[in-house]
């Protein structure tokens, strides 16, 4: 079992090498059509499994095609990792789509939709702002 420091170092090396492989070595048009970028790599403590999280820019069809292309390229990527890194055993590689950027942009869009409501309430003074009260003093609005 590898130390946490070694696991993190191997994950970073795999991330760097796979990014380079995706950029220059994979000729599959499906992978290039979706603008694939590596978000994170998680390596198991025994260094046997590597989960590579990718973010794919594009519509749903391009994302699906890019994931199919990555699945087809997985044996090639694993072989390249084995040749480029000096590891006793080459980890099994799995590509997973990271949708956190999509969720984050959806949350930001929702917040932007709510902004006019909050600004209108702030201008009309509908909601009372919190008052600074020292500890032990009674709140003038009657609340505790």
From Swiss-Prot:
GO molecular function terms listed in the Swiss-Prot or TrEMBL record: ribosomal small subunit binding
One GO BP: maturation of SSU-rRNA
Keyword hit for Secreted: no
Keywords: Cytoplasm, Ribosome biogenesis
A matching Pfam family: RBFA
Region (Disordered), start-end ranges: 121-144
Predominant cellular place of this UniProt entry's protein: cytoplasm
One Gene Ontology cellular component annotation held by this UniProt entry: cytosol
Subcellular location(s) per record: Cytoplasm
Record-stated family: Belongs to the RbfA family.
Task of the protein: One of several proteins that assist in the late maturation steps of the functional core of the 30S ribosomal subunit. Associates with free 30S ribosomal subunits (but not with 30S subunits that are part of 70S ribosomes or polysomes). Required for efficient processing of 16S rRNA. May interact with the 5'-terminal helix region of 16S rRNA.
Subunit structure: Monomer. Binds 30S ribosomal subunits, but not 50S ribosomal subunits or 70S ribosomes.
This protein's name: Ribosome-binding factor A
């Amino acid at each position: 079992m590898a130390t946490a420091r070694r696991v993190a170092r191997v994950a970073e090396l795999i991330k760097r090498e796979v990014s380079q492989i995706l950029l220059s070595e994979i000729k599959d048009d499906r992978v290039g059509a979706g603008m694939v970028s590596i978000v994170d790599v998680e390596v198991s403590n025994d260094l046997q499994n590597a989960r590579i999280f990718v973010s794919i820019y594009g519509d749903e069809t391009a994302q699906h095609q890019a994931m199919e292309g990555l699945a087809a390229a997985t044996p090639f990527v694993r072989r390249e990792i084995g040749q480029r890194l000096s590891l006793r055993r080459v980890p099994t590689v799995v590509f997973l789509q990271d949708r956190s950027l999509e969720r984050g942009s959806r949350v930001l869009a929702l917040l932007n939709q709510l902004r006019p409501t909050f600004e209108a309430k702030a201008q009309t003074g509908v909601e009372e702002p919190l008052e600074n009260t020292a500890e032990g003093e009674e709140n003038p609005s009657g609340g505790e």
